[in-house]
Each structure stands twice: as C-alpha cells, then as structure tokens.
Amino acid sequence: MESITIENYVFPSTMVNPPGSTNTFFLAGAGNRGLEIEGKFVKFTAIGVYLEESALPFLAAKWKSKSSEELANSLDFFRDIVTGPFEKFTRVTMILPLTGKQYSEKVAENCVAHWKAIGTYTDAESQAIEKLLNIFQNETFPPGASILFTQSPVGALTISFIKDDSITGTGNAVIENKQLSEAVLESIIGKHGVSPAAKCSIAERVSGLFKKSYADASVFEKPGIEKSSDPVIEEKPTIPEIGV
C-alpha cells in the first residue's frame, strides 16, 4: 500500500501504536475538508483514517463483492466502519490555522443535533460533550499541527494533540463514551461527513484490498510520517454539508 499526500502532508500507509493503542493500523483512506467560499474551494484540514488490521476480514465478509463506486455510495458500508468491532485511528492535520474552541464547538453542535434527532441524547452524552469542550478549550492549531483520535470499540475515545509529525506516547485525554467515540468518525465519513474526498479514498483503497489475496498482499509496511515537497494534484470533492 502507498501513502497518501494531501496538501504536502503525508499520511503513511501504516501506523503502529498510536496514542491509546498497542495495535497496528493500515491507512484506509485520506482526503481534505473544505468549503466553497466566494466561489473558491478553501481547504481547512487534511484527514487520514486508519483501521486496525482485523477490520479488513470483518468488512470483506459483507462488502468484498462490491465495487469502489458501490462502496462510496453506501451509507451502510461507512456505518460498518464506524461501528465495527475494531479500533480506528483518525489524524486531522491543519492546512489553515484553527482554534480548539472553534473545532470542538462545531463537533459538539453536530453530535448533539444528531443524537437529539435519533433520541439517544442522555446525561452521559451531555457530560461527554462538556469534557470534549474542556479538553479543546485552550488549544490552538497552526498549519501542520494535528488532532489525533483513537477510537476503541468498547467506547473509549483517546484524544491527542501534536505540533509536528511525532505520533507517539499517551493521549492528552480519554473520554469514556461510546456514542461520542463513534460520532467523531461519523462526522467525517458518515451521511453528512465533512470529507467526501476521504470517503471516496476509503472506498477505492478498501475495494482494492478486497481484491488482493490475503496470502500475497501485505497492507503493512514500515510506518513513518514525513512532509513532502512534491506537488499533489487532487480532484475537487463534493462540498460538505456540515461540520468542521
């Protein structure tokens, strides 16, 4: 598997022992998040989504016969990624500067609206949102800084902040709430996901992995994160509906 470059930021093909996990992850896909502003598409963040190695056989059982186009258009496929019994790791790297308050308030707004709509907003979720807002309150993220989310299938969400490319050590904070843990990734690749480009990338890469023999194709290569100076040409994604 190859790495993916978004706006000169490289997402390596594998990730080993990110904060909150001792597992190895493969890069499922990556893309930008942006908005149309005065007729110009402005990119704010680059997002990479990694899945624990056990995700591939789990997803293949149901989706291996589907084309990349079918996967890209299937809400159930992305829902299976969000809720599947394996760990997920998401890296959100700033292309433009952003404050923690700006980021967390938008995430919180979207989560609460979704939970209220489906009738699952309880005191536990309210407390989890309050913790999220407090964690981000005093943070600032210049270009190149990243927010890291490690999502456990049992419900723990490990949050980390890095100013460079070193993804090591323990997380800054852990929130024990399964709905919030899933909602963070849902907000990126779900029905109203903020990165259609990442969704298309995931569908294409995972479909390609399904077509390879597990015996012959290793999705795990030497990990590493670096910044590339090579220009990257990307297709303009569909404009996201909501979120940060």
Swiss-Prot record:
Function: Catalyzes the intramolecular cyclization of bicyclic chalcones into tricyclic (S)-flavanones. Responsible for the isomerization of 4,2',4',6'-tetrahydroxychalcone (also termed chalcone) into naringenin.
Binding-site list for substrate: 45, 110, 187
Similarity comment: Belongs to the chalcone isomerase family.
Organism: Nicotiana tabacum
GO BP: flavonoid biosynthetic process
Record carries keyword Hydrolase: no
Domain of life the protein comes from: Eukaryota
Molecular function in Gene Ontology: chalcone isomerase activity
Site (Important for catalytic activity): 103
Isomerase among keywords: yes
S-S bridge residues: none
Protein name per UniProt: Chalcone--flavanone isomerase
Assigned keywords, A-Z: Flavonoid biosynthesis, Isomerase
